[in-house]
Amino acid sequence: MNNDTPIVPKKFLTVFILLASCFALWGLLNNMTDNLVPAFQRIFTMDQSKAGLVQVAFYGAYAVLAIFAAVLAEEFSYRKGVLIGLAIYIIGALLYIPACIAQSFDIYFIAIFIVAGGCSLLETTCNPYVLSIGDESTSVRRLNFAQMFNPVGSLMGIVLAQQLILSHLNPATADERALMDEATRQGIIHGELFWVCAPYVGLCAIAALIWICFFVKREGERDVTRSAFSRVVVALLFSIVPLTVLYFIFPEMNKVHWVLCGVLGPVAYVALMKDYREMLLILARTPRYWMGVIAQFFYVGVQIAAWTWLNVYCQKELGVTPADGAIYYMIGLVLFLVCRWTATFLMKYFNPALMMAVFSVGAICCCAGVMYLPSDVLFTVEIGDHTLPFAANILCLVAMSGFMSLMFPTIYGIALGGLDPKALKLGASGLIMAILGGAIITPWMADIIGNASSSWCCLVPGFLNTWDPDLKLTQTSLRASFIVPAICFAVVLVYALAFSKRKQ
């Protein structure tokens, strides 16, 4: 590896900055959307399963539209793919306005799906776009560098959600709201939905500015032919028609199954088109690629699952409030950001795959610490008005975020490294479809947490088996559930070791 090769050549610096802003944009949106689940539960007085449709819409859009995004980039260009992704992002965010006026969760569901669809197009095109603007020997470092802006956006998303959405929720419970007169209740709901809507509409201005910058940054692209346009339209129909039909014909269908069935549409398109079928065969014959898709599926799943249950774990083990638990999550995100910056620098001197193997071992050790180390308080930290206790197991839980930091972009870069250029864009879509792991791994972990008699619970000493009526879980099952992240990190470790001796 030539250490003197620039990560980003000067001629691509402007494009790289615009792409990095897109990374921050979808990171911001991801973490704002996570907070819509508790918000909608309170506003619409719905149960957790229906509020959880927010996540189904979000990850479903990623899985279903990733192949369409690849076709878009293949037939048009990366730049046009980014432009269309940003446009869809803006349209979805603007739909929050009629959703707020109509006070309709169904319109919000559609808006979230469209916004996430825009993010899916952005991720599918921006990641390989970053890989392509420079020397291949620095591609993994360049992608890690761009991905550093993603957790910056994530932190901003958490702050915006806390300050603009959650802080404006009325504290009245569902029972208290039921006793209110209609005018009072509608006034409260209208005010709450206004603050749900406001930050998303504000993001439209930022997305529009980025869109304008990309629009004026032309780079001698080919003209779009009628044939290419037709192929893109057909790919879009294959992506959305099966999903729409399933949604209206089988409204009671398990939403995870709904998404999995919806993915069959775009997959069928790829199988039916001869040139895309050839690309698919290239990908199937490239172990570093399809193994990378599997590793990415488990990595995204473990990231979302671990962060989903971090707050609950802190509440149970330390007796802290949900607000304090959110601070532990923010500390983990800051560590995630710092470690990603550090790892990107170290990749100048060390093999990225070998570094990922070391980080995977560290993450597995953290899982063991979360499962077995005591929760006796070692020290406390004052953050504003909050006093946060830290125990050995909590330190491991927070440190896990640091070890996760380099995995997504490194898996992505290794999987696409050296891939036949003809299959690169379709290959990128497979790695984005792997984000569906977030909708599969998280429920798996939840099943263990909610089942005190699960066979997994035998992994944790029985003396920790205490029932918490408020959180509706046992300490044993909560600790035992972290065997799932350990398994996921083990998959990433196997992938890293398989390619650690090959030239990156």
Regions found by a protein language model. Give the residues of each.
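Extracytoplasmic
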Residues: 14-46, 122, 126-127, 306-314
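Cytosolic juxtamembrane N-terminal segment immediately preceding the first transmembrane helix
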Residues: 1-26, 42, 276, 280-281
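C-terminal ends and interior cores of transmembrane alpha-helices
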Residues: 87-102, 362-386
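Conserved MFS/SLC helix-loop-helix module at the cytosolic interface between two early adjacent transmembrane helices
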Residues: 64-106
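A late C-terminal transmembrane helix in Major Facilitator Superfamily
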Residues: 154, 416-458
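Intracellular juxtamembrane helix-capping segments at the cytosolic ends
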Residues: 121-135, 405-420, 429
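Central cavity-lining transmembrane alpha-helices of secondary-active solute carriers
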Residues: 53-73, 330-343
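Extracytoplasmic gate region of multi-pass secondary transporters
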Residues: 33-37, 158, 162-166, 239-262, ...
